[in-house]
């Protein structure tokens, strides 16, 4: 009986997956805390305010789901949707919306992407990366031109750079 139990235990040990094998079917990811996402959004909004622009800012997670959405008092009503869609686009494609705007011009191989719902081919959306990982994206709408929107979004990322580098 003792020999049978010992053999059964040995067989179970050999049949059980190793810890490294069990992890092959999953992965771990980190997310911005609501506080960190809010810090980025506020920094982007403040950067645009200092430049004299009334804007909306969206921060989304890696799946493109909104974490923070801010609109300055006099930013146009449309800026909320535009910022949210820019952030979704940057997170979804893991690249800046300015890059996508250039790559999806008429006649380019990727021009069909412009027909996707929520796809926003205008500068101002940036991917939030830290420690080799994508956390999501931040986007701004309402400044005069995508370049100005992008500068404000970059200020938002800069404000949280220390918190997301590890």
Annotate each predicted stretch with a short phrase.
Residues 7, 13-14:
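Cysteine-centered motifs
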Residues 15-19:
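N-terminal signal peptide c-region/cleavage motif recognized by signal peptidases
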Residues 21-166:
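Flexible, solvent-exposed loop/hinge segments and secondary-structure transition points
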Residues 1-8:
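Bacterial N-terminal signal peptides that target proteins for export
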